[in-house]
Amino acid sequence: MAEIYLAGGCFWGLEEYFSRISGVLETSVGYANGQVETTNYQLLKETDHAETVQVIYDEKEVSLREILLYYFRVIDPLSINQQGNDRGRQYRTGIYYQDEADLPAIYTVVQEQERMLGRKIAVEVEQLRHYILAEDYHQDYLRKNPSGYCHIDVTDADKPLIDAANYEKPSQEVLKASLSEESYRVTQEAATEAPFTNAYDQTFEEGIYVDITTGEPLFFAKDKFASGCGWPSFSRPISKELIHYYKDLSHGMERIEVRSRSGSAHLGHVFTDGPRELGGLRYCINSASLRFVAKDEMEKAGYGYLLPYLNK
């Protein structure tokens, strides 16, 4: 379990937005990074606190990188002291952290936003200080007042970070013609390739692994580890939205099958015997379901947007 504090204009809408994101466990609203230790809603202009949402999330379900990408989806990162119709220092944008270990992920996302926009953004990145929980009537405001004021579209939380429409599944005829016999049997008929002799069991180059049927990105190489099981093993997908999970009772066992989102290709299974320091999961994946894209090939192959996150 981890937490981050995000300022992005009126906190009513921002809290409702984050509460809808899979992997977010709890939200609350408050006032952060003012000049003094106490404040209230009426005193914000005097104390210089920012309206802020506390986001508590399950790192196994959603990463800080994903949380921040959702954040940038609904703010104007170039606007100074204004979001929507709300003006004033209390409506400034900010990312406030408690754990300095979060800084690499924060700076990576911020720098990528600046690269895309071509200029420095107005979002402040600071250690959390002087955080005050807001009054009760502000907590879960839009849940209690569904028609209340909101400056953002909270349904943006339902839109995936990686658009499945960009990775359309080919027809069975095309798949049969384009895939090897083994890749077809594994992805379309849920077969299992032989351990230890497959293509990527011992591959640890920088890059990403994509669905061999659609090209949809699935795993970062940085999340691959040597499990000794004979198949490629990953601690997590690039985003959990890219994977679909199914109960598998075949062969007298109870397992969780994993399939790709867009192609519904059989990938393998996920187990709970992975390294604890990596989150405890082991995605055991058939090489025949994957295509590896090396770091120096990613831009040309259309995956340049993922380059900033390879090592973070």
UniProtKB/Swiss-Prot annotation:
Residues 172-295 form the MsrB domain. It is a peripheral membrane protein. In the N-terminal section; belongs to the MsrA Met sulfoxide reductase family. In the C-terminal section; belongs to the MsrB Met sulfoxide reductase family. This is Peptide methionine sulfoxide reductase MsrA/MsrB 1. Transmembrane segments: none annotated. It catalyses: L-methionyl-[protein] + [thioredoxin]-disulfide + H2O = L-methionyl-(S)-S-oxide-[protein] + [thioredoxin]-dithiol; [thioredoxin]-disulfide + L-methionine + H2O = L-methionine (S)-S-oxide + [thioredoxin]-dithiol; L-methionyl-[protein] + [thioredoxin]-disulfide + H2O = L-methionyl-(R)-S-oxide-[protein] + [thioredoxin]-dithiol. Its main location: membrane. It is found in: Cell membrane. GO terms for cellular component: cytoplasm; plasma membrane.
